[in-house]
Swiss-Prot record:
<dbReference type="InterPro" id="IPR036821">
    <property type="entry name" value="Peptide_deformylase_sf"/>
</dbReference>
<dbReference type="GO" id="GO:0046872">
    <property type="term" value="F:metal ion binding"/>
</dbReference>
<feature type="active site">
    <location>
        <position position="149"/>
    </location>
</feature>
<dbReference type="GO" id="GO:0042586">
    <property type="term" value="F:peptide deformylase activity"/>
</dbReference>
<protein>
    <recommendedName>
        <fullName>Peptide deformylase</fullName>
        <ecNumber>3.5.1.88</ecNumber>
    </recommendedName>
</protein>
<dbReference type="InterPro" id="IPR023635">
    <property type="entry name" value="Peptide_deformylase"/>
</dbReference>
<feature type="binding site">
    <location>
        <position position="106"/>
    </location>
    <ligand>
        <name>Fe cation</name>
    </ligand>
</feature>
<comment type="function">
    <text>Removes the formyl group from the N-terminal Met of newly synthesized proteins. Requires at least a dipeptide for an efficient rate of reaction. N-terminal L-methionine is a prerequisite for activity but the enzyme has broad specificity at other positions.</text>
</comment>
<dbReference type="GO" id="GO:0006412">
    <property type="term" value="P:translation"/>
</dbReference>
<feature type="binding site">
    <location>
        <position position="152"/>
    </location>
    <ligand>
        <name>Fe cation</name>
    </ligand>
</feature>
<keyword id="KW-0378">Hydrolase</keyword>
<feature type="binding site">
    <location>
        <position position="148"/>
    </location>
    <ligand>
        <name>Fe cation</name>
    </ligand>
</feature>
<dbReference type="GO" id="GO:0043686">
    <property type="term" value="P:co-translational protein modification"/>
</dbReference>
<comment type="similarity">
    <text>Belongs to the polypeptide deformylase family.</text>
</comment>
<dbReference type="Pfam" id="PF01327">
    <property type="entry name" value="Pep_deformylase"/>
</dbReference>
<keyword id="KW-0408">Iron</keyword>
<keyword id="KW-0479">Metal-binding</keyword>
Length: 197
């Protein structure tokens, strides 16, 4: 399929709750979902991302893909897709996030990273690419990714979770970069890599 432009903060599709993908009585998914999943994987891979939600490429459907280390410091990676995810988490800390351990980035906020409070454990239930039920869970970075991508599908950005000086720094970065308006995007493989991979 294709690498697709990634929408940047300010695009309304990022602030709109996505629509669940319909499932047939026989458990089948619409044929075009396979193409969407391929586009998501190709775009995420070209961007060197650990996850990508459909609305980040302008498609308001409830699906995300991931290719993420199992947890910080471990060598293994987990790769997959979750359709119509439902998220569960452990408690989210109410303290100021640690700038060394809690830094988070987003392909829709290219090149920026800010400390973000997240639960250390998360689980999503949903469907795989064949429409079969799946459960995916993890801790650390993997849990952070599950929360981040499901948040996208609910119409939120990680910037919404920032507090204190980190929230102020993010607002300055959005303004400095000229974001926060509709119609902005970047295309992995064509535009410079904002994260310097």
């Amino acid at each position: 399929m294709a690498v697709v432009p990634i929408r940047i903060v300010g695009d309304p599709v990022l602030r709109t709750e996505t629509t669940p993908i319909p499932v047939g009585d026989d458990g089948s998914l619409p044929a075009e979902v396979a193409d969407l999943i391929r586009d998501l994987y190709e775009t995420m891979d070209a961007a060197n991302g650990v996850g990508l939600a459909a609305n980040q490429i302008g498609v308001s459907q409830r699906v995300f893909v991931y290719d993420c280390p199992d947890s910080r410091g471990r060598a293994g990676r987990r790769r997959g897709v979750v359709i119509n995810p439902v998220l569960e988490t452990s408690d989210i800390p109410e303290t100021m996030p640690d700038p060394d351990d809690d830094e988070e980035g987003c392909l829709s906020v290219p090149g920026e990273q800010f400390p973000t409070g997240r639960a250390d454990w998360a689980r999503v239930t949903g469907l795989d690419a064949d429409g079969s039920p799946i459960t995916v869970e993890g801790t650390g970075l993997f849990a952070r990714m599950l929360q981040h991508e499901t948040g996208h599908l609910d119409g939120f950005l990680y910037l919404d979770r920032l507090i204190g000086r980190h929230a102020r720094a993010a607002k300055r970065a959005v303004k400095h970069n000229g974001w926060g308006v509709p119609g902005l995007s970047w295309t992995p493989g064509e535009d410079p890599d904002p994260f310097g991979h």
